[in-house]
UniProtKB/Swiss-Prot annotation:
Assembly behavior: NDH is composed of at least 16 different subunits, 5 of which are encoded in the nucleus.
Keywords: Chloroplast, Membrane, NAD, NADP, Plastid, Plastoquinone, Quinone, Thylakoid, Translocase, Transmembrane, Transmembrane helix, Transport
UniProt record, GO biological process: ATP synthesis coupled electron transport; electron transport coupled proton transport
GO MF, one annotated term: quinone binding
Originating organism: Populus trichocarpa (Western balsam poplar)
Gene field: ndhF
Catalytic activity: a plastoquinone + NADH + (n+1) H(+)(in) = a plastoquinol + NAD(+) + n H(+)(out); a plastoquinone + NADPH + (n+1) H(+)(in) = a plastoquinol + NADP(+) + n H(+)(out)
Protein name as annotated: NAD(P)H-quinone oxidoreductase subunit 5, chloroplastic
Stored InterPro entries: NADH_UbQ_OxRdtase_chlpt_su5_C (IPR002128), NADHpl_OxRdtase_5_subgr (IPR018393), ND/Mrp_TM (IPR001750), NU5C-like (IPR003945), Proton_antipo_N (IPR001516)
Stretches that traverse the bilayer: 9-29, 39-59, 89-109, 125-145, 147-167, 185-205, 221-241, 260-280, 282-302, 329-349, 356-376, 398-418, 429-449, 556-576, 620-640, 734-754
Localization terms from the record: Plastid, Chloroplast thylakoid membrane
Any single Pfam family the record assigns to this protein: Proton_antipo_M
Membrane disposition: Multi-pass membrane protein
Protein function: NDH shuttles electrons from NAD(P)H:plastoquinone, via FMN and iron-sulfur (Fe-S) centers, to quinones in the photosynthetic chain and possibly in a chloroplast respiratory chain. The immediate electron acceptor for the enzyme in this species is believed to be plastoquinone. Couples the redox reaction to proton translocation, and thus conserves the redox energy in a proton gradient.
C-alpha cells in the first residue's frame, strides 16, 4: 500500500495534457483541431476518470488503514531556509478528491452537449481541464506555500471561466469583480503565511501545528499572542473570500454570468469549497485560539442568515441558487467554528452533490428556454418568464424537485442528515446561534420552493409577455467570444415569431456521450441545435406555429440522474447506525474515515446517537422546513390566484391601515433583498468611488504640484537666464559685480540666521 502512495503525486497532473494538446493542435493543425473540436471532450473525461479511480482506491485504503501519509521533496536547502514540495494524503484529501473528480466528470459530460453550440467550445475545455488540475493540486498540497500557488491558479481559472463570454460588458465586470474581491482575501492569506513562517520557521502543516501549540501554551507574552491571532485571522480572510462568506461574498452572484456548467462545478462543489478546505486543514491551528474560533462561527451564522434573506426576491434562477450556496456554506463555516469537524465535512459533501444537481437542472431549463427567447440571459434565466414547465421537462422537474427537497432538509435526502447534525450541535454551542440557524432552515425551504414553483408550476409566462406586444423572440447564435448575434428567420408575428428551418444544408453530428444522433441545422452561417418540436395550433381558422420547451437530450440528463442517486444515498455515509450493529461492524463510514483527523483535534470519535433523541430533535427542524414550504406554496402556487375569488380571501385582501402597513413592510423587505441588502451599493460608494476620487486627487497632485514644482523651477531658471543675458550687455566685469552682490546677500542672510539661532 505504501508503494502505491509513492506514485500518487501524479494525480495532480493527469488532466494537464488536455490543455497542452489542444494548444499544440491549434498551433500546428488549427483547421483540423477546430473541425474535430468535439473529440476533446473524450480525453478530458477519460483522464479525470483515471483520477477518480485512483481517488476511490485511496478512499477505501483510508477507511481501512486510518493513516496519514506525507511525501516531500526538498527543492531549496540552506542553513536558515528550506523549501519543500510534496503531497499529503489524509481523510480530508481523500474526501475532496472524490468530490472533485465525481462532480467534475459529470459536469464535463454535461458540458459536451450544453456548450456544443458555442464556438468557444475548445477554450472552455482548456479552462475546465486546467481548473481541475489546479484544484487537485490544491487539495493534495503538503504545505502552505504550495497551497498558495495552487490557490492562485484556481483563482485565475475562475476569472477565465466567469469571463468566458467577455465581450458582454456585464460578464467582463463580473469576472473583474470576482478577481478583485478574491485578491483582497488572497493578500490576507499571503500575509498570514509569511507571518506564520516568521514565527515558526516552517511551512509544513505538522510542524506548524506543533510549534504553534507550544507558543500558545508556553508563552505568556501578550504582544506575541496578539500577533499570532492576527496571523490566524489573515489566514481565515483568504477562506472568507474564496467561499463567499460575509463581507467578501459580493462576487458570487455576479459570477453566475459564466456558463451554467461552471456554476455547477466551481460555484457549488469545488472552488467555493476551497475556503472550507483551508479552514478544515488549519483547524488544529485555529482551535487553540478561542477568538478565531468564535469569529469563524460568527461569520458563518451571519452568512447563513444573509444569504437566505438575499435569495428571497431574486428573479434570476442562477442568482437565487448562488445565494443559496452562500448560505449553505455558512452552515459549514458555522460548524467549523463550533468545532464540529465531522458535521462540517458531512454537510460539505451532501450540499455539493445536491447543489450541483440544482445548477445542472437550472442549466437544462435555461437550455430549453433559449429555443424560445434566444440567447438572452436576461430572459432565459428569468423565473418571471418561466412557469408551467412540468409537462414540458418532466425529468428535469423531478431531478430539480429532489435537489430542492434535499436542500430544504426533508428526510431521507442527503442534506437532511448533515444539516440536522449542525443544527443539533448549535444548541450546545449557543442558543442564539441555534435560533438563527433553525429559523434560516425555514427560510431556506421558503426561497427554494419559491424557485421551484415559479419555474415549474402555473403557465409559461413568456407567452403572456409576447402577447402584450412588448417582447419579441429572436433566433440567436453565440460567437467565438460569447457575443450574441440575432438571426431572425421569419417576419415577426404578434404572438410569437414564426420559426422555420431550412433543411437544405443540414449536417448531422454526434456527441461522444449522446445516446442517439441529433440533427444540427445550418442557418445563415451559424450553427444551432434545435431541440424543440413545433406544435401547430388552430387559431380563428388559421394555423399558427408555437414552440414550447422540450426535455433536454440524454447527454444533459444523464449527469443529472447520477447526481439524483448521490442526493438520495450519499447521506448514508454519515448516519450513525452503530447501535444497531454487532460490535465488530461499523457502518458509520464518515466517522471511521475521520479517525486520524478527529484524534488530531482531540475530539470524540464515537458519534453514535440515540435514535429517540435524534427523531425528537429532527422533528422540530423538519417542521420548520415544512412550514417554509407551506408559506411558499400559499404565496406562489397557482391555486392561490384562483382562490382569490373566494369570499374569505377577498375579506383578507381588503385594504385597511394594517394591510397598508403590512404591504409597506413587505415592500421594504423585498427592496432590501432584491438590491442585495444594499451591500454592493455601499461598497460602490465607499470603496469604489472613494478609491476613484483618491486616484483622481493623487493624479491632480502629481500633475499640478509635483510636476508643477519641477517644471516651475525649469521655467524660472530659463526666464531668469534670458533676463540676465540682456541686462549684462556682454561685459565680464558686470557679471563679476553681480556675482559678488549675490554672494554678499547670501552671507548677510546666513549670518542673520546664525545669530538668531545662537541667541536661542
Amino acid at each position: 500500500m505504501e508503494h502505491t502512495y509513492q506514485y500518487l503525486w501524479i494525480i495532480s497532473f493527469v488532466t494537464l495534457p488536455v490543455p497542452m494538446l489542444i494548444g499544440m493542435g491549434l498551433l500546428l493543425f488549427p483547421v483540423s483541431t477546430k473541425k474535430l473540436h468535439r473529440i476533446w471532450a473524450f480525453p478530458s473525461v477519460l483522464l479525470l476518470s483515471i483520477v477518480m479511480v485512483f481517488s476511490i482506491d485511496l478512499f477505501i485504503q483510508q477507511i481501512n488503514s486510518s493513516s496519514i501519509y506525507q511525501y516531500v521533496w526538498s527543492w531549496t536547502i540552506n542553513n536558515d531556509f528550506s523549501l519543500e514540495f510534496g503531497y499529503l494524503i489524509d481523510p480530508l484529501t481523500s474526501i475532496l478528491l472524490i468530490l472533485i473528480t465525481t462532480v467534475g466528470i459529470l459536469v464535463l459530460v454535461y458540458s459536451d452537449s450544453y456548450m456544443s453550440h458555442d464556438q468557444g467550445y475548445l477554450r472552455f475545455f482548456v479552462y475546465m481541464s486546467f481548473f481541475n488540475t489546479s484544484m487537485l493540486g490544491l487539495v493534495t498540497s503538503s504545505n502552505l506555500i504550495q497551497i498558495y500557488i495552487f490557490w492562485e491558479l484556481v483563482g485565475m481559472c475562475s476569472y477565465l471561466l466567469i469571463g468566458f463570454w467577455f465581450t458582454r460588458p456585464i460578464v467582463s465586470n463580473a469576472c473583474q469583480k470576482a478577481f478583485v474581491t478574491n485578491r483582497v482575501g488572497d493578500f490576507g492569506l499571503l500575509l498570514g503565511i509569511l507571518g506564520l513562517y516568521w514565527i515558526t520557521g516552517s511551512f509544513e502543516f505538522q510542524d506548524l501545528f506543533e510549534i504553534f501549540n507550544n507558543l500558545i501554551y508556553n508563552n505568556d507574552n501578550e504582544v506575541h499572542f496578539l500577533f499570532v491571532t492576527l496571523c490566524a485571522f489573515l489566514l481565515f480572510s483568504g477562506a472568507i473570500a474564496k467561499s463567499a462568506q460575509f463581507p467578501l461574498h459580493v462576487w458570487l452572484p455576479d459570477a453566475m454570468e459564466g456558463p451554467t456548467p461552471i456554476s455547477a462545478l466551481i460555484h457549488a462543489a469545488t472552488m467555493v469549497a476551497a475556503g472550507i478546505f483551508l479552514v478544515a486543514r488549519l483547524l488544529p491551528l485555529f482551535v487553540v485560539i478561542p477568538y478565531i474560533m468564535k469569529l469563524i462561527a460568527l461569520i458563518g451564522i451571519i452568512t447563513v442568515l444573509l444569504g437566505a434573506t438575499l435569495a428571497f426576491a431574486q428573479k434570476d434562477i442562477k442568482r437565487g441558487l448562488a445565494y443559496s450556496t452562500m448560505s449553505q456554506l455558512g452552515y459549514t463555516m458555522l460548524a467549523l467554528g463550533m468545532g464540529s469537524y465531522r458535521a462540517a465535512l458531512f454537510h460539505l459533501i451532501t450540499h455539493a452533490y445536491s447543489k450541483a444537481l440544482l445548477f445542472l437542472g437550472s442549466g437544462s431549463i435555461i437550455h430549453s428556454m433559449e429555443v424560445i427567447v434566444g440567447y438572452s440571459p436576461d430572459k432565459s434565466q428569468n423565473m418571471v418568464l418561466m412557469g408551467g414547465l412540468t409537462k414540458h421537462v418532466p425529468i428535469t422537474k423531478i431531478a430539480f424537485l429532489l435537489g430542492t427537497l434535499s436542500l430544504c432538509g426533508i428526510p431521507p435526502l442527503a442534506c437532511f442528515w448533515s444539516k440536522d447534525e449542525i443544527l443539533n450541535d448549535s444548541w450546545s454551542y449557543s442558543p442564539i446561534f441555534a435560533i438563527i440557524a433553525f429559523s434560516t432552515a425555514g427560510l431556506t425551504a421558503f426561497y427554494m420552493f419559491r424557485v421551484y414553483l415559479l419555474t415549474f408550476e402555473g403557465h409559461l409566462n413568456i407567452y403572456f409577455q409576447n402577447y402584450s406586444g412588448k417582447k419579441n423572440s429572436a433566433f440567436y447564435s453565440i460567437s467565438l467570444w460569447g457575443k450574441q448575434g440575432s438571426k431572425i428567420l421569419k417576419k415577426k408575428m404578434r404572438l410569437l415569431p414564426l420559426l422555420t428551418i431550412n433543411n437544405k444544408n443540414n449536417n448531422e453530428r454526434a456527441s461522444f456521450f449522446c445516446f442517439f444522433w441529433k440533427k444540427i441545422y445550418q442557418t445563415g452561417g451559424t450553427v444551432r441545435k434545435m431541440t424543440c418540436p413545433f406544435i401547430t395550433i388552430n387559431h380563428f381558422g388559421t394555423k399558427r406555429i408555437f414552440s414550447y420547451p422540450q426535455e433536454s437530450d440524454n447527454t444533459i440528463l444523464f449527469p443529472m440522474l447520477v447526481l439524483v442517486l448521490f442526493t438520495l444515498f450519499i447521506g448514508a455515509i454519515g448516519i450513525p447506525f452503530n447501535q444497531f450493529n454487532q460490535e465488530e461492524m461499523n457502518f458509520d463510514i464518515l466517522s471511521k474515515l475521520l479517525i486520524p483527523s478527529l484524534s488530531l483535534l482531540h475530539q470524540n470519535q464515537n458519534k453514535s446517537v440515540d435514535w429517540y433523541e435524534f427523531v425528537t430533535n429532527s422533528t422540530f427542524s423538519v417542521s420548520i422546513a415544512s412550514f417554509g414550504i407551506f408559506i411558499a406554496s400559499s404565496l406562489y402556487k397557482p391555486i392561490y390566484s384562483s382562490l382569490q375569488n373566494l369570499k374569505f380571501l377577498n375579506l383578507v385582501a381588503k385594504k385597511g391601515p394594517k394591510r397598508i402597513l403590512r404591504d409597506k413592510i413587505i415592500n421594504v423587505i423585498y427592496d432590501w433583498s432584491y438590491n442585495r441588502g444594499y451591500i454592493d451599493v455601499f461598497y460602490a460608494i465607499s470603496l469604489t468611488e472613494g478609491i476613484r476620487r483618491l486616484a483622481e486627487l493623487t493624479s491632480f497632485f502629481d500633475r499640478r504640484v509635483i510636476d508643477g514644482i519641477t517644471n516651475g523651477v525649469g521655467f524660472t531658471s530659463f526666464f531668469a537666464g534670458e533676463g540676465i543675458k540682456y541686462v549684462g550687455g556682454g561685459r565680464i566685469s558686470f557679471y563679476l559685480l553681480l556675482y559678488l552682490f549675490y554672494v554678499l546677500i547670501f552671507l548677510l542672510i546666513s549670518s542673520s540666521i546664525f545669530s538668531s539661532f545662537s541667541s536661542l
